[in-house]
């Protein structure tokens, strides 16, 4: 009635020699023999952390004439680091006999190497045509080549052991990551190695400065060309697992060992994912500008200008870019079938950025000044978003397998000598071809609008006293066409299983179509005020306060955007408008320096002698910061929409009159929405705790004559040890909902330090 899978044990629980896989034996033989007593934790080893850092700078200055000057500067740095990967796997040196037999590196676990080479060249020529007309020309380049690789990089380690199909490219050399249950894993380094991103910048610029009457004019041109190779991997050399599955008792699930699984040559799971070859993106942009600082009269100055910018879409030098055509539901390739080298992404030539500012001395006394301004600034899309177009099918390989726990057909279980099928580079074009591979697809908006910022300010500054200044300002900004990533193949709420509802998606057999689209925006409004006291009578201070609000549509519906994430559904992105993840409503800062009124030229103890040396020279300073918390989302611990986003319904505000870290918000104010519907709660509706921090320094200066001074100082960071609580558990239905169990990263406990310094 209840059949069970049985596995016959080997006689005497010893694997017969004819059942030991030769490749499994090879892999087992590269483990070093124990050098410590016991049957576990019986090998100890250590490796040095070796750093070699050198560099130099050169500069040449030359005056061709009194009106023509030139300089050239060159910088170079070469950094090398050979370091243990971590204590858990540090470090397994390759046995000498194994190194003679196989093509292995110096270590079979635990070492990674980093190489960083940077160099830069700058050329500058300045020519004075007239005292009021100057031209400055600049050009140069900068190159960075950071590389991190495993200790056996370049060795055909897997191939020499008999594991075929692993060392298929020059970046897939070395050992695979071999995880053997109950044993230290074998690997020349972390799975994602090697990484070899490279970046080279070339730039040319020219600026003309012209002073004419009340005008200070500046004209200029700027051109940049970048060659970027964001070569990164996730599992270059593959991962092979050898758990107890195939050698334990299937009834009791005991007695197995990963080493036995390795020796019989069957892997219990594996994966690999990597770029076939590095790809090189070329990025170009140029700009010209005109700026006029016009002193209208002694009380009014205007700043008027305009800047025009062009950002050409990225190209790959060998056209290895793929984009998704949402109109025809197909993949397109750079330079093929009439598709541009930028895979359809347009270039925008109307990126004009006007700028206007003014400064007005209201009464002509210099004590009351009003300043204001408005400007538009364009900026290129972050490279990480566009570069992904070269990190998808067919330029990347992704393979994985997980056999049955108790297989009945062992021919379907991958063996260690040939764990993966051959790599085939296929360019799917039709929907059917794409669906057959069932990959994650990435697409970028073909319109490719250029992101830009609009900023505006109005500032009133009033001198209250010769040492005191008060300022109040309004600052606003709006960002348009910010990059936004979301799953365009989103599953909508509905009855039935997730698999059955995929038939209603644009591509039914593809889980995710990640669309990169400049549809996001943000807006900020802030009131800023500060009171400044310049140094007098031993005291100076600055008191500032900001009341602000920042809103956007979220970080990314595909990957989340911090504590406030992205919108609940792409069908109504505007409903995701809410506080930005970095929004802080109130922030106040007080900084001060106070010389205590004791000692020479002070009010008290103003007499020479030891009493003056003891009582005088004391200085107290500090910074006090007060901030409110940041927003966070409320979610559900258990899904109710069969795979669709899980946000709750909000039935009341959800805040508490006296919250504490154990119960920060009212969890009963949020309930699961009805089945197959979206919740009505917004983004970032609740805020985490605020924080107060006191940093204080006490300094004592003792002078000995005119040439020697002894200084003692005591510094206290977070003087009162005030905890900076983090975000609460906001998963409705969780046993710890509303509870805060962490503090903010970057704000430490109280830290005291003392220093003594002698100056002579």
Enumerate the language-model features and the residues they cover.
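Short acidic-glycine motifs
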Residues: 1-658, 680-760
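Flexible internal linker/loop segments at domain or repeat junctions
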Residues: 662-676
